Every structure is written in C-alpha cells, then in structure tokens.
C-alpha cells in the first residue's frame, strides 16, 4: 500500500534539527529513564517519516522528546502518525492548566516502573520549569467541585486513612531509603487515592482530599529521587505542585519547590537550585506559612548558595533560617513538616559549611547533627555521618574521617538509597589521594561488601 510521507513529523524533525539516528537515541534514552524498554532505531524513524503507523507508547515518548527539544508542548497527536488513534499517557512537560489534565498526568506516572535509572538528567526543561513556577505563583485556586454526581462518596475517614498510609511509607523511607515501599505506594496512590479525587464529597472533605493527595504524590516523588530515578521524581514533584493549586496551599507548594531545589542541587544544577529555593521563599510570602516552614525554605536557599560558593548569600540565608526557626511552634505546624527539627536544620548547616570549605564550622555543626539526629531517621543520620567524615577530612584528620565513614557504612547497610551510596562514593573519591594506605584499602573493601550485600 502506498503511503503519503508524514509531513508533520518531517517538519518537526527539521525544526528540532535532529537526525533519524539522533531522534532514535533520544527516544531510547528517555524511555530508559522511565523504566521502559524501547528499541527504536533510525530505520524505524525513517518508516514513520514515510507514513508507517506507530505504537502509542513510542508516540508518547517521541512527543516528549520533541517537547523537551523545542521548549513547548508537543502532543502525540501533533506528530501526524498514521494509526495513532489517541495520545499516550501525557507527561507533565509543562504545568497543566486544567486539573483534569494534571490528574491524567498523575495516573500515567503511576504506570511507570520505579527502578533506578540514576542520571543527572531532569525531565522538565528549564524553560518549562520556569513557566510552571510562574504559573503556580500567579494562579488562583481551582477550588473543589463539591457534591457533584458520582457513584462513589468520599469522607474524612478516607482522608485519615490516606494520611496514615502516607505517614507509614514516609517512616519506611526514612528508615530504609526510597527503594523500600516505592512500588507499593505507587500502586496505593493509583488504586486508592486518585479515584477519590473524582468522587462526590463535601467542600471540607474535597479540600482535605486534595491536600493529602498532594502530600502523597510528593512522597512518591521523593522516594523516586532517593532511588536515583530523577526524571520520574521531577515529574511527580511538579505534578504535586499542581495539586496544591486546587486548594491554594502555598505553604506546601513552596515546600515542593524547596524539594525540587534540593534535587537540582544534588545533581549539580546550581543555578536552577538557587532559583527554585528563592521561588519557594517568595511564593510563600503572604501565605499561612509557619516560621518552621520559612526556616526550611531559607535553609534550602542556603544549601544552593553554598554549592555556588556564595559565602555572603549563604550566610544571610542561614541567619534567616535560624531567625525563623527560633519562632517555630510545633502546635502551628502541619504534620508533614514535623521532620524539620533542630537536628535537621543543623544538618543542613553542616552541609553548607562543608560545601563552603569552612573546616571549623563544618566540623562543629556536623558533630551536633550526628548527636541530635534521632536514629529513626536512619538515612539522615547516615548523611550526617558522611558529612562529619568529610569535615574531619577538611581538618586534615584522615583516620577520624575514615572511622566515621566506616560507621556510617556499617549502620547504613540496609539503606536502599542511591543518595546515601552517592555520599559514600563521593567520600571515596576525596580519600583516593591516599589510596596506598591500608586504612583506605580496608574502607573501600568494606564499601564493596556492603554494596554487594544489597543484592543478596
């Protein structure tokens, strides 16, 4: 059968300045980030240019590749592909204007595999992220559609159940890392949470439902971040940000921006981290954000500025965080903010001084962070111990540095956390100049054994 060439696809490829081989590689890479297997080759691209049909999954990936490359939303239906009856699961390349689209995006995300695809790549291009933040900043609350016709009726009992489940998964995350529970929470969110958002409910129940749904989506995103699947985490967090617009929850929305800053900073995207942290600070102004929340936003700004080696800016942000924290009252705070205690703030400061290469301050704060961190936050304690080890190294004490790091590895053996492993490997890199010493050799062997035990 003769086919007409696909003029739309040919035009998009020309605009994006991408070859058949280049487009095929971008599609394979993006699919791999999402835990999908896609065997697209340049031969397949040519067939599609010639007018052949395509599977919806491949069409969705191709559309998102063009969206990222061109800096605007490209849907699968825009590709001109024969046999493409409908677009595949939408991805939050841009900030969804309609709530229905945001919920569709989240439903699609829950179908993606949670396996680690560790990479420094983020799913949302800078242009789309800036547009998303601006949209959130200026948006008016969507509001909830109370008492609409639906075969399902939601109540506050459902809200309490979701919050209890989410808190349980948060505890698992703190104790064992994001690798524990991510898949189960993803399925719970898909099967038990998202359907309730389309149920019938009162104004009060609807408000509470969207609030707890945003919190749950944020936890799933954070788990994906900890596993090392940064593209998936990026999209979950941005989708959670969109849910906060329903109720106008600026305090929690700003905390999601702070978490996006945390992720960008971890991946070395320093400018992006600074902008997101400042967006959190500014976005929460005029809201009901508590002093503890404001301290958290400022602490994330300090972390980003420290990575940028901006001593003046980081010092200002740390002082601001400390000033807000002094006014914190647990009775005013939402439950999701309970983790941000004195130990957490001190731990953030220890990271700041480590990145600013301030040996004395880094050591002082790292010691305090280790002493004050509750062992139930096993991953956080592991981070703090590695920062303490790095602080000893900054002060020229190799033996104490390795002894402290060794304890962190021993206590963190059960952690399924790509972030914790990254802390350890970063430390290994810092002591590599002493590779000939027996103490370094023994530590490297300990790390290798600990990593191997995770696969047993």
Language-model features, listed with the residues they occupy:
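Short amphipathic recognition helices of helix-turn-helix/homeodomain-type DNA-binding modules
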Residues: 1-26, 38-138, 142, 148, ...
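Generic anion/oxyanion-binding catalytic loop in active/binding sites
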Residues: 12-13, 34, 51, 205, ...
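Short amphipathic alpha-helical interaction patches enriched in hydrophobic/aromatic residues
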Residues: 13, 31, 49-52, 173, ...
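Charged, solvent-exposed alpha-helical segments that act as regulatory interaction surfaces
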Residues: 36, 71-75, 327-330, 414
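Conserved binding/catalytic microenvironments
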Residues: 149-159, 163-456
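Amphipathic alpha-helical scaffolds
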Residues: 31-38
């Amino acid at each position: 059968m003769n086919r007409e060439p696909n003029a739309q696809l040919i035009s998009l490829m020309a605009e994006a300045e991408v070859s058949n081989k280049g487009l095929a590689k971008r599609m394979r890479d993006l699919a791999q980030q999402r835990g999908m297997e896609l065997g697209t080759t340049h031969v397949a691209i040519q067939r599609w240019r010639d007018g052949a049909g395509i599977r919806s999954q491949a069409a969705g990936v191709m559309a998102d590749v063009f969206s990222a490359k061109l800096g605007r939303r490209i849907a699968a239906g825009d590709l001109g592909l024969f046999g493409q009856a409908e677009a595949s699961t939408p991805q939050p390349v841009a900030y969804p204007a309609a709530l229905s689209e945001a919920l569709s995006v989240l439903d699609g995300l829950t179908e993606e595999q949670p396996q680690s695809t560790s990479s420094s790549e983020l799913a949302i291009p800078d242009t789309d992220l800036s547009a998303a933040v601006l949209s959130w900043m200026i948006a008016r609350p969507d509001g909830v559609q109370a008492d609409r016709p639906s075969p399902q009726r939601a109540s506050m009992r459902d809200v309490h159940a979701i919050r209890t489940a989410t808190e349980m998964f948060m505890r698992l995350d703190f104790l064992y890392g994001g690798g524990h529970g991510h898949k189960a929470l993803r399925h719970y969110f898909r099967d038990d949470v998202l359907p309730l958002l389309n149920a019938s409910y009162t104004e009060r129940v609807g408000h509470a439902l969207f609030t707890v749904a945003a919190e749950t989506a944020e936890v799933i995103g954070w788990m994906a971040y900890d596993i090392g699947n940064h593209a998936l985490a990026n999209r979950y967090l941005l989708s959670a940000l969109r849910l906060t617009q329903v109720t106008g929850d600026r305090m929690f929305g700003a905390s999601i921006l702070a978490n996006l800053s945390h992720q960008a900073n971890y991946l070395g995207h320093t400018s992006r981290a600074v902008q997101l942290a400042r967006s959190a600070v500014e976005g929460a102004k005029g809201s009901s954000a508590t002093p503890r929340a404001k301290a958290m936003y400022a602490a994330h700004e300090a972390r980003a500025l420290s990575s940028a080696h901006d001593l003046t800016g980081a010092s200002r942000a740390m002082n601001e965080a400390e000033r807000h924290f002094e006014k914190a009252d647990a009775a005013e705070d939402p439950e999701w903010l309970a983790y941000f205690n004195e130990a957490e703030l001190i731990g953030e400061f220890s990271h700041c001084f480590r990145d600013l290469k301030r040996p004395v301050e880094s050591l002082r704060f790292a010691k305090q962070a280790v002493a004050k961190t509750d062992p139930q936050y096993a991953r956080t304690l592991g981070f703090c111990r590695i920062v303490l080890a790095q602080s000893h190294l900054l002060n020229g004490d190799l033996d104490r540095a390795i002894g402290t790091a060794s304890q962190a590895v021993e206590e963190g053996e059960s952690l399924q956390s790509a972030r914790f492993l990254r802390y350890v490997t970063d430390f290994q890199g810092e002591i590599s100049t002493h590779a000939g010493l027996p103490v370094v050799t023994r530590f490297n062997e300990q790390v290798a054994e600990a990593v191997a035990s995770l696969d047993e």
